[in-house]
């Protein structure tokens, strides 16, 4: 009997998720986070979510056929102060395919804080470099609407939506 129970546990789907809803001025995006393969990134993201950190921030980088990025800037492109950076979980086996969420970072390996992106194409060249920690489970039409927004360069920033795309809130389901 113990063998059967152990076998059932080992062969079951071990993918554990935390589900969230992100409401933007373009619509709602449903998200699932992988807290098994990306526990540090997931805990970090949830810390910001629970603090309502993302409320009022914009998608500041929108590159059609690549990514939409958010999580750190206000509408005037000033940066919101963050917690300390986390370790990079880029080698967790998750791939930067369409609809997945990854941690944005600087050129420093362990520099991710609050910013994240949603892949709008299969960007497997990012695998092993940028940590994937979740996926879109509903609202890809909203992701596509954001991806297709008109953009311009503003100061030091490129690919900024002409009309701000704002996160109203991100909440756990």
Language-model features and meaning:
Residues 1-4, 80:
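Low-complexity, intrinsically disordered regions enriched in charged/polar residues
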């Amino acid at each position: 009997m113990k063998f059967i129970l152990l076998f059932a546990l080992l062969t079951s789907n071990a993918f554990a998720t935390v589900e969230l809803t992100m409401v933007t001025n373009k619509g709602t995006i449903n998200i699932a986070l992988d807290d098994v393969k990306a526990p540090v990134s997931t805990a970090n993201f949830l810390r910001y979510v629970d603090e309502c950190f993302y409320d009022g921030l914009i998608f500041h980088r929108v590159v059609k056929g690549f990514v939409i990025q958010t999580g750190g800037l206000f509408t005037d492109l000033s940066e919101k102060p963050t917690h300390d950076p986390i370790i990079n979980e880029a080698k967790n086996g998750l791939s930067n395919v369409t609809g997945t969420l990854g941690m944005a970072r600087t050129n420093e390996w362990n520099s991710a804080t609050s910013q994240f992106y949603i892949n709008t194409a299969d960007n497997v060249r990012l695998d092993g470099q940028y940590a994937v920690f979740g996926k879109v489970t509903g609202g890809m039409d909203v992701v596509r609407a954001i991806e297709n927004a008109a953009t311009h360069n503003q100061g030091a920033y490129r690919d900024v939506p002409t009309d701000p795309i704002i996160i109203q809130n991100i909440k756990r389901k």
